[in-house]
Each structure stands twice: as structure tokens, then as C-alpha cells.
From Swiss-Prot:
Pathway(s) per entry: Amino-acid biosynthesis; L-methionine biosynthesis via salvage pathway; L-methionine from S-methyl-5-thio-alpha-D-ribose 1-phosphate: step 3/6; Amino-acid biosynthesis; L-methionine biosynthesis via salvage pathway; L-methionine from S-methyl-5-thio-alpha-D-ribose 1-phosphate: step 4/6
A biological-process GO annotation: L-methionine salvage from methylthioadenosine
Cofactor(s) of this protein: Mg(2+)
Subunit structure: Monomer.
Transmembrane intervals: none
Role summary: Bifunctional enzyme that catalyzes the enolization of 2,3-diketo-5-methylthiopentyl-1-phosphate (DK-MTP-1-P) into the intermediate 2-hydroxy-3-keto-5-methylthiopentenyl-1-phosphate (HK-MTPenyl-1-P), which is then dephosphorylated to form the acireductone 1,2-dihydroxy-3-keto-5-methylthiopentene (DHK-MTPene).
One Pfam family, short name: Hydrolase
Nucleotide-binding in keyword set: no
Reactions listed under catalytic activity: 5-methylsulfanyl-2,3-dioxopentyl phosphate + H2O = 1,2-dihydroxy-5-(methylsulfanyl)pent-1-en-3-one + phosphate
Family: Belongs to the HAD-like hydrolase superfamily. MasA/MtnC family.
Name of the protein in question: Enolase-phosphatase E1
Organism: Gluconobacter oxydans (strain 621H)
Length: 227
């Protein structure tokens, strides 16, 4: 019996196009000015982490290279999160989730399911995104948020940590993602899994795992409350 649904964001609840075409360009444009802020301890800490990992290199150039290569480095995610905070809070950015997502999340929560997020984006970024959607503030629906500080999403140990944190048997947790390697890692940790194969994102079906085109289909497959 599924008691908690653990959700990825990009390609699962939010179109990849929004992240790729809206959020990433916004962060790229704002990052140079942010990196010059020597008073914000979060920026200072992230910059120090980059210098430690890439001595002798310009931290901004490292971040720009990471973005071009779509490297999900923790310092970059932290810095991107700061730029997105400004954008969401001033109304420049507003997350437009897949239309099936808000009603499904509300139905699951109302039906007694626990909900949590596991994304490569920082926890503050996750909360900003779900707090500023075109469908309103959805953060109260979630009890936990996990990011790369828990570990990599393709590492089974990360899902073991999440299982311990939420205090449930692994098979009572359903992990939803569009990425096959993440689903494989979650399966190795004992979680139930389902791949979201969103047609508009061109998701490639991953063999060996259940698949669904949207959250309504997930509800049907796993006997969850239906919106």
C-alpha cells in the first residue's frame, strides 16, 4: 500500500520547456551580478565551494560552463535558487505546472497520502516554485523537500536516506520521475516507482518500470485517490 508519493519536478510535474526556456535563461542573465555580491553569506559560501573544487578558475565561468553542460552541481543550484527567488517573489517568474498536477496532488493529500519532493534544484528553489504557481501556492501539500544535499538522484543510498527520514517501509513510498536512471536507483533501494512519460517533453520510455502519461494514470495504476 502506497502511503507517500515522492515526486521529481522537471519533466514530472513541470514541463521541461519551462525550466529550459524560462528558468535557466533567467538565472544565466542574473548570475553575473549575483556573483559580485560579497555580502551575502550564501553567495560567498557557494563561490568558495567552486574555488575549492576548481582552483585557479573564475567561479562565474565555472558556473556558466556547468549550465551549458547541464551539470547539476550543488553550488550552481544554490546560486540559481537565489536568482529564481527574486524572479518568483517579484512576479517575473510563475511556474505553470502540467494541468493534471494540482488536482492530483490535492486529491492525494485530501485522501491521506503523504507527499514529498526530491529534485536536483535546491530546497528553497523547490519551495519557491511550488509557492508561486499559476494554480496558486501548493507548498502546504508537501511535508518534506529533498535536494542534492541528500545525495545524487542516481544513487540508491539517497533513497535509503529519504526512506529513513520519512519513517516508512521503502515499498510504501512511490517515486515518480521521468529519468530512468533515477527510477533504477530508487528501485534498488526498495521503493515503488513509476516513470512519467510526458508526450510534450519527448520522454523516452525506460524498460523495466511502470509508466504513465500523467498523474491521473498514476492514480489508476496504483490505486491512489483520483482527482
Amino acid at each position: 500500500m502506497i502511503r507517500l508519493v515522492l515526486l521529481d519536478i522537471e519533466g514530472t510535474t513541470l514541463p521541461i520547456s519551462f525550466v529550459r526556456d524560462v528558468m535557466f535563461p533567467y538565472a544565466a542573465k542574473a548570475l553575473p551580478a549575483l556573483m559580485q555580491d560579497h555580502t551575502n553569506p550564501i553567495v560567498v559560501g557557494a563561490r568558495a565551494d567552486i574555488v575549492m573544487e576548481h582552483p585557479g578558475q573564475d567561479p562565474l565561468k565555472v558556473c556558466q560552463d556547468w549550465m551549458k553542460a547541464d551539470v547539476k552541481a550543488a553550488p550552481l543550484k544554490t546560486l540559481q535558487g537565489l536568482t529564481w527567488r527574486q524572479g518568483f517573489e517579484d512576479g517575473t517568474l510563475q511556474a505553470d505546472l502540467y494541468p493534471d498536477v494540482p488536482p492530483a496532488l490535492k486529491a492525494w493529500s485530501k485522501g491521506g497520502l503523504r507527499l514529498a519532493v526530491y529534485s536536483s534544484g535546491s530546497i528553497p528553489s523547490q519551495k519557491l516554485l511550488y509557492g508561486h504557481t499559476a494554480q496558486g501556492d501548493l507548498t502546504p501539500l508537501f511535508e518534506d523537500f529533498f535536494d542534492l544535499s541528500t545525495g545524487g538522484k542516481k544513487d540508491a543510498a539517497s533513497y535509503e536516506k529519504i526512506t529513513a527520514a520519512v519513517g516508512l517501509p521503502a515499498d510504501e513510498i512511490l517515486f515518480l520521475s521521468d529519468i530512468g536512471a533515477e527510477l533504477d536507483a530508487a528501485q534498488r533501494a526498495g521503493l515503488s516507482v513509476c516513470q512519467l512519460v510526458r508526450e510534450q517533453d519527448g520522454t523516452v520510455p525506460h524498460p523495466g518500470v511502470p509508466q504513465a502519461p500523467d498523474l491521473n494514470a498514476v492514480s489508476t495504476q496504483f490505486g491512489l485517490p483520483v482527482a
